[in-house]
Amino acid sequence: MPRVKTGIVRRRRHKKVLKRAKGFWGSRSKQYRNAFQTLLNAATYEYRDRRNKKRDFRRLWIQRINAGARLHGMNYSTFINGLKVAGVDLNRKVLADIAAREPEAFQVLVNTAKGARNG
C-alpha cells in the first residue's frame, strides 16, 4: 500500500476552507489554493471594516441629527451643546432615530436645547 501523508486531516482542513469560501466567484470557491488566498484577504477586510463600521454609523447619526436640527433653525453643534447644558443624556444613535421617526419629539428636544443655551 502506498504511504498516505495527512490524508484525512488535509481533506478536513480543505473542506473547512472551501465551506468558508462558499459564495465566492469562480475558482475562488472551488479550488483550495485560490479559496485560501481569498479568505486571507477577506479576513483583513473583516478586521478593518469592523472598526470602520463604528465610524460610519456615527457619521450617519450625526448627519441625521444635523438635518433634523436644521429643520428647526439650529445646527448640529449648537444642538448637542444645548442638550449637554440641559442635562439631556441621549446618545447620537437614539437622537438620530428620534429625528427620523418622531419629528414632534425631536422638536421638543430642540426647544429644550434652545432654552438651555439661552439661559
Swiss-Prot record:
Cited InterPro entries: Ribosomal_bL20, RIBOSOMAL_L20_CS, Ribosomal_protein_bL20_C
Pfam entry (one): Ribosomal_L20
GO terms for cellular component: ribonucleoprotein complex; ribosome
Single GO BP term: ribosomal large subunit assembly
GO molecular function: rRNA binding; structural constituent of ribosome
Gene3D superfamilies: 6.10.160.10, Ribosomal protein L20
Keyword terms: Ribonucleoprotein, Ribosomal protein, RNA-binding, rRNA-binding
Family listed: Belongs to the bacterial ribosomal protein bL20 family.
Role noted for this protein: Binds directly to 23S ribosomal RNA and is necessary for the in vitro assembly process of the 50S ribosomal subunit. It is not involved in the protein synthesizing functions of that subunit.
Protein name per Swiss-Prot or TrEMBL: Large ribosomal subunit protein bL20
Originating organism: Deinococcus geothermalis (strain DSM 11300 / CIP 105573 / AG-3a)
